[in-house]
Amino acid sequence: MKAILRASRIGRVILRYRLDALLEGTPAERWLRLAKPFVPRASAEIAVQSRGARLRLALQELGPIFVKFGQILSTRRDLIPADVAEELTLLQDRVKPFDGEAARLIVERALGLPVSVAFASFDTVPLASASIAQVHAATLPPDANGVRREVVVKVLRPEIERQIDADIALLHSLATLVERTHPRADKIRPREVVAEIEGTLSAELDLQREGANASVLRRFWEGSDDLYVPEVIWSHTAERALTLERVYGIPSDDIAKLDAAGIDRKALAAKGVRVFYTQVFRDNFFHADAHAGNIWVDSDPERRLNPRFIALDFGIMGQLSQEDQYYLAENFMAIFHKDYRRMAELHVEAGWMPSNVRIDELEAAARSVCEPYFTRPLSEISLAQVLIKLFRVAQRYELTLQPQLILLQKTLLNIEGVGRQLDPKLDIWAVARPVLERILRERYSPRRVLRELSKRLPEIMTHAPDMPRLVHSWLKQQVEGRHQIDIRSTELLALDLSLRKLQTRVVTAITGSGLLVVAAVLYGLHPDGWYLGTVPVWSWISGGAGSAALLVAWLRR
């Protein structure tokens, strides 16, 4: 019954804000048409608003879960029009706070301690309130030196899980209906969108997980002059309550306060871009909700000329697969070099596009997207916009994107927005390019490869005894002709020649890999004998021969 009433309310809101065109061509359209006479007409003020603004207002009226839905939907620029996405980014996740005494009870249940024991003080008036949780100021009991440390406690809203479950169930039903009946369902992919929203909200409901995210990010940026991450107080953290060191700073979009504090905004903007690319390509762990409200600037007067960001809210973090990380970095470098052919090839090699796509068509599409940008002043070029438009054009060729890449698009857009607000003349290309080049150089250096091999030494040692037997078995199959093909035509002759070349490449690659394994084993065993630097000479010889074999295999593509 509650679901029916909730669906009825959603229908009324859709009609009042004139959003029924979104369901055009579906059975829901007929029901909405029948209900239209019984719903008050939109005011003249609403009627003149753009479709994006009307959708934003409707989501705000439907409540905090739908606000969160709109915020997540704003990241799906591959699915919704740009004007609607821009409007949805204005959604503010601010709601009326719940009772402070209720927050106190939730903290006590979560920690298994009375608040008066766990904390020296706990302010029942929240510092901030959002749809999932709210934040309270507190102090810890005195430490050995008698110091009472200031902290903030993030507390989940009461009954929030039940409310989210009910709204998500309703969204799943609506998504199924749209998928079955909407003429553009294959492009919109409604069930995929709802599943993504459900996953994001589920992650935000576990504050212990958020604490783990903060802890990992802090470890990556320990001692950095570019980014500070508050410490997690694990003794006072549980699934429904997260305690963090209290930090003080200036919101990154409060330009007046930044100027009053004497902050070097130009240096700060460049740091923001560098931090983002380092998180993505060095750490593979990036803050994926990096809007201005979650990025503060350290207000310490001593940091005016060397400013530092402070990260807040770690509910949504992003990670890429190693393949996506590599292909994305190569894509950016191809954009820098205006190598449209390479862009097209990378989209196919990454598995984002079907292998039967014509590379020359994709190359022409990439050129049509990028060339107009290259005619603009450098301060107006947006890598995020180029990437989004590339992916949007590629949709015509059945583009398949992982949710993490979509999350990265949104984060890059936010970071560029923050950077340009701090420094309108920020040349993102000039800042990003050397960072990418350095990270790629370090990532694929021989020293790093050897270090990674040594980390995997136990696994290599476990499987190494089986390798000769497996290689011998495979080669024996080739010699005995178990994969021979009876050639009957010139096309099959060409295929046979290709297979022979492939066979030679595979054998060369296996040999090269084996030699690299030997190099790693020798490096890990620290044998007696000559050393070059800290690496045994025989490791250099074996590793060099293995690298040469792999290079030969690669060149024979």
From Swiss-Prot:
Disulfide bonds: none annotated. Its main location: membrane. HAMAP family: UbiB. Its EC number is 2.7.-.-. ATP binds at residues 127-135, 154. It comes from the Bacteria. It is found in: Cell inner membrane. The keyword 4Fe-4S does not apply. Belongs to the ABC1 family. UbiB subfamily. CDD domains: UbiB. The lineage of its organism: Bacteria, Pseudomonadati, Pseudomonadota, Gammaproteobacteria, Lysobacterales. The active site is at residue 289. It is a multi-pass membrane protein. This is Probable protein kinase UbiB. Residues 121-509 form the Protein kinase domain.
